Amino acid sequence: MSKDYISIIDVKNHVGEEVTIGAWVANKSGKGKIAFLQLRDGTAFFQAVAFKPNFIEKFGEEAGLEKFNTIKHLNQETAIEIKGIVKEDKRSKFGYELDATDLKVIGTSDNYPITPKEHGTDFLMDHRHLWLRSRKQMAIMQIRNAVIYASYEFFDQNGFVKFDSPILSGNAAENTTDLFETDYFGEPAFLSQSGQLYLEAGAMAFGRVFDFGPVFRAEKSKTRRHLTEFWMMDAEYPFMSHEQSLDLQEAYVKTLIQGVLDRAPQALGILERDTDLLRKYIAQPFKRVSYDDAITLLQEHEEDEDTDYEHIEHGDDFGSPHETWISNYFGIPTFVVNYPASLKAFYMKPVPGNPDRVLCADLLAPEGYGEIIGGSERETDYNTLLAKIKENGLNPDDYAFYLDLRQYGSVPHCGFGLGLERMVTFVAGTKHIREAIPFPRMLHRIEP
């Protein structure tokens, strides 16, 4: 048999042709003289049909019967090389099927643990290395890939330079209770929570820069929105105001959604995602509301029948129920801007004329998906930044290089970070963030 394989996703370009595909058997059915194989190859799923008389006619009685019986008794996840004629099939969601003409077993599979029945979450997570092969998990990973691709495309088209921040840091520059500590040749080192501080150095050297990589937070949170290891897309850019930064962030998120619609429509279909809703998010301007106005809204509606959040006061941080209500109230992605300085990081620039508030924004995704972006305008004055570091009980020596940036041509600059898995969860419409990364790391989950 030929080794010149084509991908399932490309069979639409070979209607009426005999092709060879390398694939795995996701499921099978049939009886008597016909067998149906559900095949997958990582690009898509589709069906191959084998007719017993065709195999006997092509290979003779004995050999044809042997091949057909092999097909009928294939186990789930058997790897095969299959040849056949591509045909249109309007009954299928995929639109095509394969009229099988030959088949060869490449790799056997016995007692595959994830059978076509309901399994508990713990069982599926214990077998995550196999669960990734399922139709839904494949669709989510294709959406993740589309988001990453669209990110690189957006930053390239907008003049950004890829800048790689370190993952290991020699000081506990943030709250050590949220940091993972490791030994670095006899000295303590910490896994990065964010590449932002280093990225600001890149912005002062190269202008617009972005970073994409894993970050780590030792938060003992057991929610559907939290992971201890996840991927962040951070960006920093000089000579830009806070309002201009919000415009850039909005354009970025809309580009990511459009990128998934363009590159992974079949994946969205498998997940039954409401694509009209996604298109609405692209078409409409994102809402912008101040923190104080959002608090007032929450207070005004806290007695409504359909609310399930606790009372909140000005100066309090939002919980997940508050974020959900705010984004659902407006029905589109919503920037909450100008939080109290006491709730945010030391490096954020105060709102002019209101030092108790800072020039920052969290982008809340609708449908209960919560914060997907956090960003701010950064403090540019050396003395002000130094005072803030001390006010927060931090050691200025740990921020020597960061402070140094303010002494040599400091300029207005902004930045933001987008959590990849939260964005994927939102666009895919899935319920839990653990499915948005190949091998999730959570509280009490570090295997496989």
Swiss-Prot record:
Record's keyword annotation contains Cell membrane: no
The protein's Enzyme Commission number: 6.1.1.22
One Gene Ontology term from the biological process aspect of the record: asparaginyl-tRNA aminoacylation
GO cellular component: cytoplasm
CDD domains in alphabetical order: AsnRS_cyto_like_N, AsxRS_core
Record's subcellular location: Cytoplasm
MF-aspect GO terms: asparagine-tRNA ligase activity; ATP binding; catalytic activity, acting on a protein; nucleic acid binding; transferase activity
Pfam family, one: tRNA_anti-codon
Top-level taxon of origin: Bacteria
Catalysed reaction equations from the record: tRNA(Asn) + L-asparagine + ATP = L-asparaginyl-tRNA(Asn) + AMP + diphosphate + H(+)
PROSITE patterns xrefs: AA_TRNA_LIGASE_II
Keyword set, alphabetical order: Aminoacyl-tRNA synthetase, ATP-binding, Cytoplasm, Ligase, Nucleotide-binding, Protein biosynthesis
Keyword Nucleotide-binding: yes
PANTHER family hit by this protein: ASPARAGINE--TRNA LIGASE, MITOCHONDRIAL-RELATED (PTHR22594:SF34), ASPARTYL/LYSYL-TRNA SYNTHETASE (PTHR22594)
Assigned protein family: Belongs to the class-II aminoacyl-tRNA synthetase family.
Subunit structure as annotated in this protein's UniProt entry: Homodimer.
Matching NCBIfam families: asnS, PRK03932.1
Annotated protein name in UniProt: Asparagine--tRNA ligase
Lineage: Bacteria, Bacillati, Bacillota, Bacilli, Lactobacillales
